[in-house]
């Protein structure tokens, strides 16, 4: 890896050339970036992106990828002449029940900081890898809670104008694992998150608990509120059993987490599925239909934990959680896409339901 000091060219940010991206992502796949620019402050993020976007408009810059934790992205092997801006601004401030986290802050550290101040609302989102800035993009959720439940506003850099402004949550079109900020192509982001503000509960209690597996672990009833630290501990234990807490020594955690979102279908599709399988189909109410459990669909379609079962396969389903596509060592983005297509097409052939990917796919497609 070559490093160089470019002075004020990129607002004082750290610049390196010929950088392998695989070690910077939780899936551990990706090409070698021509240039990696690491921004440790918000001013650097803004200055670097303004510079690169000006160059791109003049045809003087190749593709630009912006990311922080690298936990929800699959980067194609063949991307050439790629410039990567790594967002590493990480200040977290707490004022009363308001928590403000810069985009590069490690998400789980934000959760811990809130709990240590007696604030509830984020504990069910414990253990999720990645950065604070990624949470509104994806509308991150787990165990019955979504981050949009507590986001008040997001500070954005508009890539087309270079302007920075706070945007209220109501203008972000939050939905299930999506928002107006999410783009199918991670190279075409119209706006970049700089900071996120959350309004939490200062009563010392968690968000209402509604996820059956979690309430059972805590010995509580649905709708009850627990002590945030206890809820966090239970969530981390559940995630660890599913290989959803990062561990460099455990290849089941070399993933982007759940690769497919839970599909939302019309009620008649759910009824057809129940009749087809003759089973009690896990399902949840959704605003625009019925939400099904993607992991259940995978396993019933023949894609169980550890699929395809070949110990030499470089990419396999996790041995702990069928929804996670994992790198067993030496896998490429192409290997991941082959397995993802096999699973997606197999579920569609059996049930007539097409699963959609949860991570952002950059330079690759299903």
From Swiss-Prot:
Its chief place of residence is cytoplasm
InterPro entries registered for this protein in UniProt: FAD-bd_PCMH, FAD-bd_PCMH-like_sf, FAD-bd_PCMH_sub1, FAD-bd_PCMH_sub2, MurB, MurB_C, MurB_C_sf, Oxid_FAD_bind_N
> Could you say which EC number(s) this protein's record lists?
1.3.1.98
Residue positions of the active site: 177, 258, 358
Question: What is the gene name?
Answer: murB
Q: State the family named in the UniProt similarity comment for this chain.
A: Belongs to the MurB family.
> Which GO biological process entries does UniProt record here?
cell division; cell wall organization; peptidoglycan biosynthetic process; regulation of cell shape
Give a GO molecular function annotation for the protein: UDP-N-acetylmuramate dehydrogenase activity
> Keyword Oxidoreductase: yes or no?
yes
Tell me which GO cellular component terms the UniProt record holds: cytosol
Q: Which cofactor does it need?
A: FAD
Q: Which keywords does UniProt give here?
A: Cell cycle, Cell division, Cell shape, Cell wall biogenesis/degradation, Cytoplasm, FAD, Flavoprotein, NADP, Oxidoreductase, Peptidoglycan synthesis
Q: Does the keyword Transmembrane helix apply?
A: no
| PANTHER family on file | UDP-N-ACETYLENOLPYRUVOYLGLUCOSAMINE REDUCTASE (PTHR21071:SF4)
Q: What class of enzyme is it?
A: oxidoreductase
Cystine pairs annotated here are none
User: What pathway or pathways are given for this protein in its record?
Assistant: Cell wall biogenesis; peptidoglycan biosynthesis
Q: What is this protein called?
A: UDP-N-acetylenolpyruvoylglucosamine reductase
